[in-house]
């Protein structure tokens, strides 16, 4: 099994798959922020009319079914995320929490965000869902 830090975009990608079996080959790790970001993104998709309520709630329940270890040492994580956001010139620290956790665990970040991937590839390893199973 491959350990990875999963960001919210990658989590949503896996949850939308008819068969999220690629996730079963991964040891998924994430900051606790992941759950709130996924909840918010699903709610926004419903609010915009892009996804039916039932589908969003199903994906939210599927999140509970994914075996994700959420890391709670927020003091250490937040300090590292703050430093990363400063280093990369980011005003917000949301993405920096995922990057910080990947650094702390010395594992790659799984993301669908190409801009994020390009911005942090000099700091950590980065994978896209298409890289799984290769």
Which role does the model predict for each range below?
Residues 33-71, 77-81:
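Active-site-proximal, substrate-binding regions of enzyme catalytic domains
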Residues 11, 38-42, 101:
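Buried hydrophobic packing segments
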Residues 19-24, 63, 82-83:
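Glycine/charged-rich beta-loop-alpha catalytic/anionic-binding loops adjacent to active sites
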Residues 68-115:
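Active-site neighborhoods of divalent-metal-dependent phosphate/nucleic-acid chemistry enzymes
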Residues 1-34, 45, 50-57, 133-134:
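Short, well-structured N-terminal submotif of metal-dependent ribonuclease cores
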Residues 17-18, 41, 122-123:
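Residue-level signal for well-ordered alpha-helical positions
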Residues 14, 37, 80, 118-119:
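Phosphate- and divalent-cation-binding pockets in alpha/beta enzyme and binding domains
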Residues 3, 31, 35, 99-134:
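Acidic, PIN/NYN-like endoribonuclease modules and their adjacent C-terminal/linker elements
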């Amino acid at each position: 099994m491959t350990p990875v830090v999963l960001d919210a975009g990658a989590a949503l990608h896996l949850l939308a798959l008819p068969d999220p079996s690629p996730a079963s080959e991964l040891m998924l790790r994430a900051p606790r922020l992941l759950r709130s970001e996924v909840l918010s993104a699903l709610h926004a998709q419903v609010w915009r009319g892009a996804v039916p309520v039932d589908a969003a709630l199903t994906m939210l329940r599927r999140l509970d079914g994914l075996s994700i270890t959420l890391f709670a040492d927020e003091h250490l994580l937040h300090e590292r995320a703050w430093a990363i956001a400063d280093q990369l010139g980011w005003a917000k620290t949301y993405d920096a929490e995922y990057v910080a956790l990947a650094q702390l665990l010395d594992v790659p970040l799984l993301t669908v965000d190409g801009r994020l991937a390009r911005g942090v590839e000099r700091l950590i390893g980065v994978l896209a869902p298409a890289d799984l199973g290769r």
